[in-house]
């Protein structure tokens, strides 16, 4: 069987203490079967979570497992491809009529200057506000400063990606950058600041709102978090 990557399996894998690669391989199967107390085959897992048993672990299977094990699945935002094709709720790139300004719940700084407001797409504004509020609650101001989570790199910017091949998610106002000085585009783990274990909760907070880290998913551009699936 060819194992495909599914975003829906990642929160399941994280909850089970596995590498969250989205690939429902043998380790994922073993951990799920142990939790569900069923035979270590996908047919048995699917039957245990009331999913039509075809033996192929796809999104429906992941959602069934999550429901059975009380694992919260994040909101599913549109894919990058649908955003760029103009088929998503985010509309056209560069449309500033879709943007709103929000006040960050803790002090942010852009190149040393205080940030009064952040401009993002109205569809993600509430999630951004809630995520940052949760960061403040979990880390507190002292740890936020120590980990440079108060260093803001921008959000809305009608531009192309670093490679210049397509529009950046920033052009829709659905991506934000943090601590760019220590998380440059080409910097990889473990050297990128936001790849450190101390930042695990930071990423868990964003991911709970359906946001995606390019660093965690592709190991580059660790500053970047976006509200669009890869």
Residue ranges of predicted features:
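Acidic/histidine-rich, metal-coordinating catalytic segments
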Residues: 26, 144-157, 217-224, 228-229
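Catalytic cores and adjacent binding grooves of peptidoglycan-active enzymes
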Residues: 163-230
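Second-shell loop/turn segments in exported
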Residues: 1-2, 18, 50-53, 113-122, ...
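Short acidic, glycine/serine/threonine-rich helix-capping segments at coil-helix boundaries
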Residues: 1-79, 213-221
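Active-site acidic/histidine clusters and adjacent loop/turn architecture
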Residues: 85-145
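Active-site-adjacent loop/helix surface patches within enzyme catalytic domains
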Residues: 132-174, 184-185, 212
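Non-transmembrane alpha-helical segments in soluble domains
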Residues: 66, 129-136, 203-207
């Amino acid at each position: 069987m060819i194992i495909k990557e599914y975003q829906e399996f990642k929160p399941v894998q994280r909850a089970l203490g596995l590498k969250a690669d989205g690939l429902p391989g043998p380790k994922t199967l073993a951990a799920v079967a142990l939790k569900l107390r069923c035979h270590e085959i996908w047919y048995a897992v699917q039957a245990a979570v009331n999913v039509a048993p075809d033996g192929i672990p796809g999104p429906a299977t992941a959602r069934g497992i999550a429901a059975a094990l009380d694992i919260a699945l994040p909101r599913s935002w549109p894919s990058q491809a649908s955003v760029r094709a103009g088929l998503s709720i985010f509309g056209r790139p560069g449309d500033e009529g879709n943007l709103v300004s929000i006040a960050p719940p803790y002090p942010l700084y852009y190149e040393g200057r205080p940030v009064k407001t952040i401009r993002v797409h109205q569809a993600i504004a509430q999630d951004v506000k809630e995520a940052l509020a949760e960061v403040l609650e979990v880390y507190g101001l002292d740890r936020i400063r120590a980990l440079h989570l108060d260093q803001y790199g921008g959000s809305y910017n009608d531009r192309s990606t670093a490679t210049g091949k397509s529009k950046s998610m920033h052009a829709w106002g659905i991506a934000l950058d943090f601590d760019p000085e220590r998380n440059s585009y080409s910097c990889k783990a473990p050297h990128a600041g936001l790849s450190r274990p101390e930042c695990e909760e930071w990423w868990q907070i964003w991911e709970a709102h359906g946001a995606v880290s390019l660093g965690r998913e592709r190991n580059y551009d660790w500053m970047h978090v976006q509200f669009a699936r890869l």
